[in-house]
A protein has these predicted regions:
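Formylglycine-dependent sulfatase
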Residues: 2, 14, 18-453, 462-500
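Residues forming the ATP-binding cleft of Hanks-type serine/threonine protein kinase domains
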Residues: 459
């Protein structure tokens, strides 16, 4: 009997020791690095046409040490609404942020509030772009409005603080300062949110000469004439040929430079602009020049982002935080890099719909893996909460990505994705909504002046040049997608909702 009792005592002590050890383990830190308008094709880990000419080694490192998602789709491809989706885990019609013009309701439930309640120290540094004051954060330093690329104002502690330097560097500087001064006894949730590579694309002084002596490859659809689809895409106002204007092409500047900065920046562009004007280029030659000026400045802005991602990763390494910090890199949406002759986003077409998502989670993710499931920015909030080990509210509409991160896609994972864009008239893009299963895509333009559908077979037509809506060979597929579209609108509580 004594030996049995002794065995029981030893067993209890072992279990208690295990429980004590488990309770001593901190939940993982979460570092969410979020950029603005970062196209998949501008991250070399995605292997696109720009991968060799514009490598992104630090972003590629996250992919090499973690998981790259090939099909992360946004729910509403425009800046402020996408940010609201990330914070709330709800579609735009439920979180109230339909367009860039709306003010975010900070009184509602957000992931930052829930993580703070769960014991996390929370901070956001960089681009906010939601008009209201951030809530749910122990610390915030956010750009005023859209922000500028040089010498930004950061709003914190009730006042705007002027900083001198390049904004991408400064956002990282301030993120690192917060990491240095945070309460090290608590896990942290840090949202480092860059303005870059949003237009108007003003590179760092150190990058002005990068790509200078090369021709960046043109996309095959640069001179799209928009035939084969509804009239909607032809009504755009985001053409590289006609709509970039002097600020986007660096004939005028948006930032307020110091005299020293202006001398270097203007010194680079002025002589090149004068040489261009003497050429008097017209037609396709002018479009090609515009494209080279645009894409080089865009990629220069991305280069600064990549360097600063490297600074954050280095800090985690040097301070023993890398093994217990989940690093998540994404953007508010994709972006046009000349495809269909465009810049900007908004459309449900592929380059705008897809956003990058790369995650590193040591000990949980098999390094250098790729996921091809349909995931969404709608999933981010619940993923943060699940990583933290805290409850996911039932009114959130996404799915936690943690099973996928561990390499085990649930059998009932989503097979389709619902999209809805509301900001009518922005860059000439009409209200539209739709559904995709990754192979096929159905888009509805409900406006009275259009009242039209588009349907694409993405396997046969990956560039979405020819709508096959009405084609008899796709009758069953289109009918099934319409049924699925109606089901999703009911599931997401939008069945009776149209643009106001």
């Amino acid at each position: 009997m004594k030996s049995v009792s002794l065995l029981k005592l030893v067993t209890i002590l072992i279990l208690m020791a295990g429980m004590t050890h488990a309770s001593d383990e901190k939940p993982p830190n979460i570092l969410f690095i979020f950029t603005d308008d970062h196209a998949l094709n501008a991250i070399s880990a995605y292997g696109g046409p720009l991968a060799k000419v514009a490598p992104t080694p630090h972003l590629d490192r996250i992919a090499k040490e973690g998981m790259l998602f090939k099909h992360c789709l946004v729910s509403n491809s425009i800046c402020a609404p996408s940010r609201a989706v990330v914070l709330t885990g709800k579609y735009s019609h439920l979180n109230g942020q339909l367009t860039n013009k709306d003010m975010f309701d900070g009184s509602q439930q957000t992931v930052s509030k829930l993580l703070k309640k769960a014991g996390y120290q929370t901070a956001i540094v960089g681009k906010w772009h939601l008009k209201s004051t951030p809530t749910g954060f122990d610390h915030f330093e956010v750009l005023k409005g859209q922000g500028q690329y040089y010498n930004p104002l950061l709003f914190t502690n009730g006042k705007n603080v002027k900083h001198t330097g390049y904004t991408t560097d400064i956002i990282t500087d301030q993120s690192l300062k917060w990491l240095e001064t945070r309460n090290a006894d608590k896990p942290f949730f840090l949202m480092t949110q860059h303005k870059a590579p949003h237009g108007r694309w003003e590179p760092a002084l150190r990058h002005l000469e990068v790509f200078e002596d090369m021709e960046i490859p043109e996309p095959p659809t640069l001179f799209d004439n928009y035939a084969g689809r509804t009239t909607a895409p032809a009504q755009h106002k985001m053409g590289i040929a006609d709509h970039m204007g002097p600020h986007r092409l660096m004939f005028q500047y948006s930032s307020k430079f110091t005299p020293e900065q202006f001398k270097i920046f203007d010194g680079h562009f002025r002589s090149r602009n004068e040489a261009f004007e003497k050429l008097n280029l017209q037609g396709k030659a002018r479009t090609r020049w515009n494209y080279q000026r645009y894409i080089k400045n865009y990629l220069r802005c991305v280069k600064a982002v990549d360097e600063n991602v490297g600074r954050l990763l280095e800090y985690l390494d040097d301070n023993g935080l890398a093994n217990n910090t989940v690093v998540i890199y994404s953007s508010d949406q994709g972006f046009w890099l000349g495809e269909h002759g465009w810049f900007d986003k908004r459309w449900m077409y592929e380059e705008s719909l897809h956003t990058p998502l790369i995650v590193r989670w040591p000990g949980q993710i098999q390094p250098d893996t790729t996921n091809t499931d349909l995931v969404s920015n709608l999933d981010f909030a619940q993923t943060f909460l699940d990583i933290a080990g805290t409850k996911q509210p039932g009114d959130m509409q996404g799915l936690a990505l943690t099973p996928l991160l561990r390499g085990k896609t649930p059998a009932n994972w989503r097979k389709t994705h619902y999209y809805h864009y509301y900001e009518a008239g922005g860059h000439g893009v009409p209200v539209h909504y739709g559904v995709t299963d990754g192979r096929h895509k159905l888009i509805r333009f409900p406006d009275d002046t259009l009242d039209a559908w588009e349907f694409f077979d993405l396997k046969k037509d990956p560039n979405e040049m020819q709508s096959r809506y009405g084609d008899p060979q796709y009758t069953r597929t289109i009918a099934a997608l319409k049924e699925e579209l109606n089901r999703l609108r009911k599931q997401y509580q939008v069945e009776n909702f149209e643009n106001p």
